[in-house]
Each structure stands twice: as C-alpha cells, then as structure tokens.
C-alpha cells in the first residue's frame, strides 16, 4: 500500500523525481550469474542518460550474497531488497513496494513479468540461458515470445531480448522511453490491463488462471520462438 511505498522511499533515501529502475535478474544462481553482467552494462548506459538514476533489486535469500557481489561495481549500485530476517508477509510487501516505486523494470523473462503487469510497472524482458538449452527449447517450443505478458495479451508490446539479441545498448534504448510519459509506456499500460482482465479478478486461484491463459495462448499461437 501507500504506507509501504512511502516507507521504502524513505528508507532508501530516494529523492522525489529521481529515476528508478527495478532490476530483476532472476532467482536462481545460474540466472544471476548470467544476467548481472549484462544488466550492469544496461545500468551503465542508463546512468549516462538519466542523471541520479537509482536501482532497486529485489532478490531471494538463496542468492542475496552472490547478487550483492555481482552488482557492487554497477555504475548505479542497486539497493538490494534482501528478504532474510523478515517475515514472508513483510518481505513480500517490501517487494511490491519496490515494484510501485520503480519507473521501469528490467526483468528476466518469467512469471515475474505478470507480477510487474499487475503492479503497473512497464518493463523490458531480457534473458540468457546456456546455448544448448536455448537450441533445445527452440526446437520444442513453437511460440514467438517467452514473455508471459506478451503471450497472454497476444502482442509484442513488451520489448524482449533473448540469447544473442540480449545486447545492452538495444536493451537500454528500449528502456529509456519508459521513464517518461511516452507512447511506449502508454501501450504497456493498455496491455497490462488486457492481461489482468484475461487472467480474471475473481474465480479460480491466480496460478491456475495464469496457467490456463498461457496454455490457451500457446494453443492459439503455434509460432516458432
């Protein structure tokens, strides 16, 4: 809620009007090892364009220390939201406050993109996995996007950079307009509303609704990744 958002801004000493990026490099060790380097390169480019840039990075306890080590040299060192020592409810509220404080997010593709849509945080998705894994996935999964927001909405409004296309300059260029009242930001807000409507505000549990929506989208769009 508003109280949690105000408390987070105060605890992180974020000045009014300061641009805030939410960085979500993943929750598994392999993901953060692959992503923190290129995420840091994106942050360096954004810091040149957006004076006073702040970065918030929610993480999970299992990778909190590796994340801290891998991000300490970023041009704008992130404020890491470490859940260790907090109750699950408090940690979750703090994470959602981070979503609300941010102007835009850089996220590894996954279920977190649906959470960002629910929070109304515009995003760019970027992901790297082992090349062999990527090759196998491309052979088996015939969809044109790995982003759940795009998949459920039936669009490509969330910019997505996978594997060799995950190049920091391109990602920074896609993120930059999301920090202002741009057409790109407005388009994401419209898509987020469609996604939330598709998932439904009532009825089955959220995870089941999300799974059904994704499966329906996969069935509609049997295209090559």
Predicted regions and their residues:
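Nucleotide-activated sugar donor-binding and catalytic core shared by glycosyltransferases
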Residues: 1-225
């Amino acid at each position: 809620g508003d109280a949690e958002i105000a408390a987070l801004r105060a605890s992180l000493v974020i000045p009014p009007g300061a641009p805030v990026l939410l960085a979500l490099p993943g929750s598994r060790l392999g993901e953060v090892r692959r992503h923190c380097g290129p995420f840091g390169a994106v942050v360096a480019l954004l810091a040149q364009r957006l004076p006073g840039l702040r970065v918030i990075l929610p993480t999970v306890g299992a990778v909190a220390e590796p994340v801290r080590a891998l991000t300490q040299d970023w041009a704008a060192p992130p404020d890491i939201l470490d859940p260790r020592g907090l109750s699950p409810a408090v940690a979750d509220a703090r994470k959602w406050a981070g979503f609300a404080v941010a102007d835009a997010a850089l996220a590894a593709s996954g279920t977190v993109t649906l959470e960002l849509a629910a929070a109304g945080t515009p995003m760019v998705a970027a992901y790297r996995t082992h090349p062999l894994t990527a090759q196998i996935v491309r052979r088996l999964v015939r969809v044109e996007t790995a982003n759940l927001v795009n998949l459920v909405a039936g669009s490509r409004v969330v910019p997505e950079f996978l594997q060799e296309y995950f190049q920091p300059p391109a990602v920074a260029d896609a993120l930059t307009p999301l920090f202002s009242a741009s057409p790109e930001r407005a388009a994401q807000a419209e898509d987020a509303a469609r996604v939330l409507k598709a998932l439904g505000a009532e009825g089955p549990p959220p995870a089941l609704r999300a799974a059904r929506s994704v499966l329906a989208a996969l069935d509609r769009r049997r295209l090559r990744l």
